[in-house]
């Protein structure tokens, strides 16, 4: 993967987990 993709994933994954767990 490109570094840019990893950067995006690093931001998206915690956000998705936050929304699913509803512990924002």
From Swiss-Prot:
Please report any disulfide bonds recorded for this protein chain, giving both cysteine positions. 18-24
Q: Does the keyword Secreted apply?
A: yes
Q: Where are the transmembrane segments?
A: none
Which tissues express it? Expressed by the skin glands.
Q: Which family does it belong to?
A: Belongs to the frog skin active peptide (FSAP) family. Brevinin subfamily.
Q: Name one GO cellular component term.
A: extracellular region
Q: What is its main location?
A: secreted
Role summary: Has antibacterial activity against E.coli ATCC 25992 (MIC=49 uM), E.coli CIB 84492 (MIC=25 uM), S.aureus ATCC 25923 (MIC=6 uM) and S.aureus CIB 85462 (MIC=3 uM).
- Which Pfam family, any one of them, does this sequence belong to? Antimicrobial_1
Q: What protein name does the entry list?
A: Brevinin-1JDc
- One of the GO biological process terms: defense response to Gram-negative bacterium
Q: Can you say where in the cell this protein is located?
A: Secreted
């Amino acid at each position: 993967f490109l570094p840019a993709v990893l950067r995006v994933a690093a931001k998206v994954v915690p956000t998705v987990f936050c929304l699913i767990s509803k512990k924002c």
